């Protein structure tokens, strides 16, 4: 192995291929024949590998094939997420390689990705957040103060994913206060109280409407901010009903459980704790909530 100083001499900015100038690396003894040999110095462009990484990840330890054909049933990729530059460069090359592999019978589909989501950038005072600009935020400091769930909630609530997000400390504080209210109400309804169930119908209608809204926004529209807004609106309605004593304990518990399940992909830590506190059937990775039948 060359010393770092010797290697730096070889790789100084010069015309041509730096590997071709590294004689110690290039000229070797063949490990199979014992004869003198010359290593290949041409290299692939980075896109040659990155254009089909999603295929290799299906079968990363296969030493005989790119990937086993049994994994074709997993294709095409359901969701491609990347920055705007991906839509011009990587997406173009990935589609090119995929069509080549299709022609060779390695895949069956014409396109590698079903859906594309190009997310926006994070801005600070209107400028792109980057290390070179010195305007980045240390996530560890924010997490220590507010918790990881608060940061996750803020990032997904502050703007639609395809738009730029303006970093705002005050908005983080707002998300933190909402989660504190959510926890407080959840803790409150652990203690059984009851009122006539015929007063529950209005909030249970809201319960079903919220499940429909959040399901559509998350899984079809990829509109995470409006999904969170729908849960917050539902929470405010439930909070008023509890304060007014116009909802039964069982219905309030159902509503809290549903909200925790709807927010679980976004704020998993507090939702797990809430589901545990109200003794939900499954607190870890719960099933998506069902609508209540017979409510209209």
Model regions and ranges:
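Short cysteine-rich clusters marking metal-coordination/redox-active sites
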Residues: 30-33
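Conserved phosphate-binding loops in nucleotide/dinucleotide-binding enzymes
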Residues: 38-43, 80-83, 123-148, 162-173
């Amino acid at each position: 192995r060359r010393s770092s100083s010797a290697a730096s001499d070889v790789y100084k900015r010069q015309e041509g291929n730096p590997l071709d100038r590294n004689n110690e690396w290039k000229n070797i003894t063949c490990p199979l024949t014992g004869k003198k040999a010359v290593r290949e110095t041409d290299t692939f462009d980075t896109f040659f590998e990155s254009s089909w990484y999603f295929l290799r990840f299906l079968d990363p330890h296969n030493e005989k094939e790119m990937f086993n054909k049994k994994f074709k049933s997993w294709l095409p990729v359901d969701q491609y997420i990347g920055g705007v530059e991906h839509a011009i460069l990587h997406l173009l090359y990935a589609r090119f390689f995929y069509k080549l592999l299709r022609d060779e019978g390695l895949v069956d589909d014409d396109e590698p990705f079903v859906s594309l989501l190009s997310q926006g950038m994070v801005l600070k005072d209107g400028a792109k957040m980057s290390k070179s600009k010195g305007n980045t935020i240390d996530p560890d400091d924010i997490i220590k103060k507010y918790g990881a769930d608060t940061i996750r909630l803020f990032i997904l609530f502050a703007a639609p994913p395809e738009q730029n997000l303006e970093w705002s400390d005050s908005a983080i504080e707002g998300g933190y206060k909402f989660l504190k209210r959510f926890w407080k109400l959840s803790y409150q309804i652990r203690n059984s109280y009851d009122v006539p169930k015929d007063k529950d119908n209005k909030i249970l209608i809201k319960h079903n409407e919220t499940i429909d809204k959040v399901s559509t926004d998350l899984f079809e529209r990829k509109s995470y901010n409006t999904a969170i807004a729908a849960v917050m609106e539902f929470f405010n309605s439930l909070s008023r009903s509890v304060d007014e004593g116009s909802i039964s304990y069982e219905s309030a518990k159902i509503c809290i459980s549903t909200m925790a399940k709807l927010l679980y992909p976004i704020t998993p830590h507090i939702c797990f704790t809430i589901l545990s506190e109200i003794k939900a059937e499954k607190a870890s990775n719960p099933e998506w909530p069902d609508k209540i039948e017979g409510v209209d």
